[in-house]
Amino acid sequence: MLLDEIKRMSYDELKRLAEDIRKKITEVVLKNGGHLASNLGTIELTLALYRVFDPREDAIIWDTGHQAYTHKILTGRDELFHTIRTFGGLSGFVTRRESPLDWFGTGHAGTSIAAGLGFEKAFELLGEKRHVVVVIGDGALTSGMALEALNQLKNINSKMKIILNDNGMSISPNVGGLAYHLSKLRTSPIYLKGKKVLKKVLEKTEIGFEVEEEMKYLRDSLKGMIQGTNFFESLGLKYFGPFDGHNIELLEKVFKRIRDYDYSSVVHVVTKKGKGFTAAEKDPTKYHSASPSGKPKMLSYSDLLGHTLSGIAREDKKIVAITAAMADGTGLSIFQREHPDRFFDLGITEQTCVTFGAALGLHGMKPVVAIYSTFLQRAYDQIIHDVALQNAPVLFAIDRSGVVGEDGPTHHGLFDMNYLLSVPNMKIISPSSPEEFVSSLYTVLKHLDGPVAIRYPKESFYGEVEFFLENMKEIDLGWKILKRGREAAIIATGTILNEVLKIPLDVTVVNALTVKPLDTTVLKEIAREHDLIITVEEAMKIGGFGSFVAQRLQEMGWQGKIVNLGVEDIFVPHGSRKELLSMLGLDSEGLTKTVLTYIKARSREGKV
């Protein structure tokens, strides 16, 4: 595999290989979609790292995992790389199911240092001599989990090597004090000049690196006089850098030097997000996650959120918008441009975002916390303890609910409805269309008096923003009977309703816009008219909407049969939404077969 070949290559050959990999990643990602800019920035870093450390022996952990395409190419997946993010193909993230060289599955930011500590202690207890290396971005480093683990390194005598991949970005540009501190380390002209002079003096001596080792005290004193103790050194860690993250020869020397150090060290590497692809270099946020080529520009629910909130906020000065390093992804950059003083990007800090929103709401504001469903999981305690327990008026705009698609199991939004249903005071709304989404936002914000979650998918559609805003109105958030039939009643929530409406059977169809509280008036009406009720949801079936309906029907003393359709007890793989709904039996064809089976079975029992 390439992993062995790179150890025999000259630096000129490595540079050519880096360009070949850059070209390959660009071509495949522009075709399949994926994380382009992040991966173009870590090619040389990965080549240098794998010349010194070996993932067959050393635990190398890629935080978030979205920047590990070169790792995949080097570790035996070069021939399959064209399948990345396609159904049945390679994952866009690091996963143990794919290769034993993927030491720890990742997809969410900030987990790598804690995982590295766990592996390090396992190796120690088992008597195994292995290195632990973590590659983490400056954006992920701002997450609470990363900082918590960083704080433990000195305490448990870790020897972990942390490669800080600093490109000044997470998805959007980084924010906060730590980002400012890293920027100062990158750009301090006095320190950089002093370091350069010291390096030249050392290079002129006959014994080079040995003298540099002996003169550590002088170097550290120089750093201390110029810029004081940096953040990492204050935690008892050794800090090296910053270094050019695209200089393979330099990085290899640095990695060799720290490999056998008997203490934790941080190597600060500065890379350029989107390196080598002009469009991505100029707009790394846009190319952080590229969409497959050939798709026409369409509106998304995220776009509508930004435009809708901006419009409502012109009249309602109490509306504020909060996100966790996802201003563009959530559509809130639209709101930010018009209302910058009421927009807050708090970095990768979902827990902080929720509690920050709770306090805003408790003092008269109308906070909208917009976070992807998969990331909101990280703030479950804050949702319960800080928001719901105090009945704080906070609107959770839960983006990417349901089957997300090519990003796979780490990013599907299949748990939010389940984990929110059990929270007292929480209202849950699941619109079935863009029109319903816009009007639900308007209605909730007009009467916000406690926690409300509006969940919506990663879907695009044709339409003009003006059309949706002009038709925005206050609506009844209850259930609606859209179609009446004789053989069964189907209650669907969310955009999966559109698949249900395609079922060519004589059934009643109900749009359950509000998941919690249940619309018991409509439910009782349906229960009186039907002996077979089927619920459909694009979420985990266990403990979900269907279970909630079944419980209520049982409490009502209903004697019919209820069937819950949703995602079974599995982690859903990656693929297009169409492919995944088909696999799950939740597309119109699969639903028709399942519903017909139950209708026939009920008919044989003489119940329909």
Curated annotation (Swiss-Prot):
<keyword id="KW-0460">Magnesium</keyword>
<feature type="binding site">
    <location>
        <position position="167"/>
    </location>
    <ligand>
        <name>thiamine diphosphate</name>
    </ligand>
</feature>
<dbReference type="GO" id="GO:0009228">
    <property type="term" value="P:thiamine biosynthetic process"/>
</dbReference>
<comment type="function">
    <text>Catalyzes the acyloin condensation reaction between C atoms 2 and 3 of pyruvate and glyceraldehyde 3-phosphate to yield 1-deoxy-D-xylulose-5-phosphate (DXP).</text>
</comment>
<dbReference type="GO" id="GO:0052865">
    <property type="term" value="P:1-deoxy-D-xylulose 5-phosphate biosynthetic process"/>
</dbReference>
<keyword id="KW-0414">Isoprene biosynthesis</keyword>
<dbReference type="Pfam" id="PF02779">
    <property type="entry name" value="Transket_pyr"/>
</dbReference>
<comment type="pathway">
    <text>Metabolic intermediate biosynthesis; 1-deoxy-D-xylulose 5-phosphate biosynthesis; 1-deoxy-D-xylulose 5-phosphate from D-glyceraldehyde 3-phosphate and pyruvate: step 1/1.</text>
</comment>
<feature type="binding site">
    <location>
        <position position="277"/>
    </location>
    <ligand>
        <name>thiamine diphosphate</name>
    </ligand>
</feature>
<dbReference type="GO" id="GO:0008661">
    <property type="term" value="F:1-deoxy-D-xylulose-5-phosphate synthase activity"/>
</dbReference>
<feature type="binding site">
    <location>
        <position position="138"/>
    </location>
    <ligand>
        <name>Mg(2+)</name>
    </ligand>
</feature>
<dbReference type="Pfam" id="PF13292">
    <property type="entry name" value="DXP_synthase_N"/>
</dbReference>
<feature type="binding site">
    <location>
        <position position="167"/>
    </location>
    <ligand>
        <name>Mg(2+)</name>
    </ligand>
</feature>
<feature type="binding site">
    <location>
        <begin position="107"/>
        <end position="109"/>
    </location>
    <ligand>
        <name>thiamine diphosphate</name>
    </ligand>
</feature>
<dbReference type="InterPro" id="IPR009014">
    <property type="entry name" value="Transketo_C/PFOR_II"/>
</dbReference>
<keyword id="KW-0479">Metal-binding</keyword>
<dbReference type="InterPro" id="IPR033248">
    <property type="entry name" value="Transketolase_C"/>
</dbReference>
<comment type="subunit">
    <text>Homodimer.</text>
</comment>
<dbReference type="InterPro" id="IPR005477">
    <property type="entry name" value="Dxylulose-5-P_synthase"/>
</dbReference>
<keyword id="KW-0786">Thiamine pyrophosphate</keyword>
<keyword id="KW-0784">Thiamine biosynthesis</keyword>
<protein>
    <recommendedName>
        <fullName>1-deoxy-D-xylulose-5-phosphate synthase</fullName>
        <ecNumber>2.2.1.7</ecNumber>
    </recommendedName>
</protein>
<dbReference type="InterPro" id="IPR005475">
    <property type="entry name" value="Transketolase-like_Pyr-bd"/>
</dbReference>
<dbReference type="InterPro" id="IPR029061">
    <property type="entry name" value="THDP-binding"/>
</dbReference>
<dbReference type="GO" id="GO:0005829">
    <property type="term" value="C:cytosol"/>
</dbReference>
<comment type="similarity">
    <text>Belongs to the transketolase family. DXPS subfamily.</text>
</comment>
<dbReference type="Pfam" id="PF02780">
    <property type="entry name" value="Transketolase_C"/>
</dbReference>
<feature type="binding site">
    <location>
        <position position="350"/>
    </location>
    <ligand>
        <name>thiamine diphosphate</name>
    </ligand>
</feature>
<feature type="binding site">
    <location>
        <position position="66"/>
    </location>
    <ligand>
        <name>thiamine diphosphate</name>
    </ligand>
</feature>
<keyword id="KW-0808">Transferase</keyword>
<feature type="binding site">
    <location>
        <begin position="139"/>
        <end position="140"/>
    </location>
    <ligand>
        <name>thiamine diphosphate</name>
    </ligand>
</feature>
<dbReference type="GO" id="GO:0016114">
    <property type="term" value="P:terpenoid biosynthetic process"/>
</dbReference>
<dbReference type="GO" id="GO:0019288">
    <property type="term" value="P:isopentenyl diphosphate biosynthetic process, methylerythritol 4-phosphate pathway"/>
</dbReference>
<dbReference type="InterPro" id="IPR049557">
    <property type="entry name" value="Transketolase_CS"/>
</dbReference>
<dbReference type="GO" id="GO:0000287">
    <property type="term" value="F:magnesium ion binding"/>
</dbReference>
<dbReference type="GO" id="GO:0030976">
    <property type="term" value="F:thiamine pyrophosphate binding"/>
</dbReference>
